[in-house]
Swiss-Prot record:
Pfam families: UreD (PF01774). It comes from Klebsiella pneumoniae. The keyword Chaperone applies. One of its GO terms (cellular component) is cytoplasm. Required for maturation of urease via the functional incorporation of the urease nickel metallocenter. Keywords: Chaperone, Cytoplasm, Nickel insertion. This is Urease accessory protein UreD. Its main location: cytoplasm. Belongs to the UreD family. InterPro entries: UreD (IPR002669). UreD, UreF and UreG form a complex that acts as a GTP-hydrolysis-dependent molecular chaperone, activating the urease apoprotein by helping to assemble the nickel containing metallocenter of UreC. The UreE protein probably delivers the nickel.
Length: 270
């Protein structure tokens, strides 16, 4: 059971995607509070590129964010963000973020948020769940920054719980949880950058290609393939290497998964 939360911003966003006129459209976007999206872009004609806008003031203890997205059969959506999500120091209350992404058969989701930055003293709990069907396609990443290493600031105190799940036809393929408390970072080898990338469905050939792309991260990166779910995990102390490797892996996997060449979201180039 979750602990009681101090009253803060209650923000919800529910997105519904459908096929219409030969392309994926955002059929519905219902939101409460300062959590919304920009108008969809179509740099690839039928594929919908959507920018999710987190609150500009960041996320503090007591805030609750709930994000859900449903993709109807045949949809292809790429969701990213203009900037990092920032979790600020808390006086004790917990910030809670729930993200639930549901894909119908033949739907494709590219979930590519910017990094989440946890300031020293933050108290945050995150749940991200992907519900797929056997014929859904998923390419997603999750990048956490502990402290602000670019200015020499570490996650010296605070609490972070990050839970990540992938379900296919109501069966769990991945259930993992990262739990960090009071500056104890031995479980992440004292590295400030923690990344996970997911690809479904994948093959042994894709696994081999991804492992080659992970070479710049040395011993602090690995990839595995279980029940067609390719999972990439890495740790680093260099955000530029992290971001470059993540994008390199995405660019390698995307044509195999979707049959489309990589098209960088315009916001990444600004």
């Amino acid at each position: 059971m979750l602990p009681p939360l101090k009253k803060g911003w209650q923000r919800t966003l529910d997105l519904r995607f459908q096929q219409a006129g030969g392309k994926t459209v955002l059929a519905s976007a219902q939101h409460v509070g300062p959590l919304t999206v920009q108008r969809p872009f179509y740099p690839e004609e039928e594929t919908c590129h959507l920018y999710l806008l987190h609150p500009p003031g960041g996320i503090v203890g007591g805030d609750e964010l709930t994000i859900s997205a449903h993709l109807a059969p045949g949809c292809h959506t790429l969701i990213t963000m203009p900037g990092a999500s920032k979790f600020y120091r808390s006086s004790g209350a917990q910030a809670l973020v729930r993200q639930q992404l549901t894909l119908a058969p033949q739907a494709t989701l590219e979930w590519l948020p910017q990094d989440a930055i946890f300031f020293p003293g933050a108290n945050a709990r995150l749940f991200t769940t992907f519900h797929l069907c056997a014929f859904s396609r998923l390419l997603a990443w999750d990048l956490l920054c502990l402290g602000r290493p670019v200015i020499g600031e570490t996650f010296s105190h605070g609490t972070l719980s990050n839970r990540l799940e992938v379900w296919v036809d109501d069966e769990p393929l991945l259930v993992e949880r990262l739990q960090l408390q009071e500056g104890e970072l031995s479980s992440v080898a004292e590295r400030p950058w923690v990344g996970t990338l997911l690809c479904y469905p994948a093959t042994d050939a894709l696994l081999d290609g991804v492992r080659d792309a992970l070479a710049p991260l040395g011993l602090y990166a690995g990839a595995s393939l279980t029940d067609r779910l390719l999972t990439v995990r890495f740790l680093s102390d260099d955000n530029l290497i992290c971001q470059r490797v993540m994008r390199d892996v995405w660019q390698f996997l995307r044509p195999h998964l979707t049959g489309k060449s990589p098209v960088l979201p315009r916001i990444w180039l600004t």
